Amino acid sequence: MLDLTPTELERYRRQMMLPGFDEDAQRRLKSFTALVTGVGGLGGTAALYLAVAGIGKLILVRGGELRLDDMNRQVLMTHDTVGQPRVFKAKETLEKINPDVEVEAVFDYITPDNVDHLVRSTDITLDCAHNFAERDLLNEACVRYRKPMVEAAMDGMEAYLTTILPGQTGCLTCLFPEKPEWDRRGFAVVGAVSGTLACLAALEAIKLITGFEKPLVSELLTMNLGRLEFAKRRIYRDPHCPVCGNHAPWRQHVSRSLESQLRDLDVDRIFNLSRPI
């Protein structure tokens, strides 16, 4: 693992006071790359808290320009960037907040053409995409390459969160075999709601990477933040799931080259840090 500089030791001193969160945990954070999609009120805020916690590298993925009605929940943006690509301003802001974190900005949406490369370039994914088309692509790629994915979504005052470990838990398609209706521009949102969920998503990633607390594995956390009601329910892997099931198409058509790449992935380094329930 990478060593910590004197500046980093001082910067992260307060979180290293937590039981189980020692210098080794901090070095693990520094050695990890996280892919964050969306880079809005959810993804942008999650990226912020990963950056200040000391993640080694962030890959931010979001196409499109910033709109004025986005600004009620944007913590990385300023008014003068309305009409410009949000992902570059997010990179600039994060690098100013913590210059020790490497930030890569990808001005694009998640597509079939880029998803494999992006997922293979990272250790963990935070799925904060704004529609199920992108979420499904991320889910399939994370399962294919056995990369952990923190899944977070909200609409109005309601939100859900879970952590997906391919090979150990169900995937997003197990959870939502039929996709809910999702209006990408029409959903209601209060910035404090997306921000609350984003903080929990970032914390899930930090727990999974460092192992200092048990992550939300094989459970779905649902929240109604208007009434402050929280519930957990067990989720299961569907053996007939078309994405992660025993007979998923990618299992039957994987090439020898890809099989070799999968064996070379340092999956155990990630999975052994979690303690599945």
Curated annotation (Swiss-Prot):
Q: Does Cell cycle count among this protein's keywords?
A: no
Q: Which GO terms describe its molecular function?
A: nucleotidyltransferase activity; thiosulfate-cyanide sulfurtransferase activity; ubiquitin-like modifier activating enzyme activity
Give the InterPro entries listed for this entry: ThiF/MoeB/HesA, ThiF_NAD_FAD-bd, Ubiquitin-activating_enz
**Gene3D superfamilies membership:** NAD(P)-binding Rossmann-like Domain
Q: Does the keyword Protein biosynthesis apply?
A: no
**Entries under SUPFAM superfamilies matching the protein:** Activating enzymes of the ubiquitin-like proteins
List UniProt keywords, sorted A-Z: Nitrogen fixation
A GO cellular-component term linked to this record: cytoplasm
Q: GO biological process annotations for this chain's record?
A: nitrogen fixation
As for family, the record states:
Belongs to the HesA/MoeB/ThiF family.
Annotated protein name in UniProt:
Protein HesA
Q: Which organism is it from?
A: Leptolyngbya boryana (Plectonema boryanum)
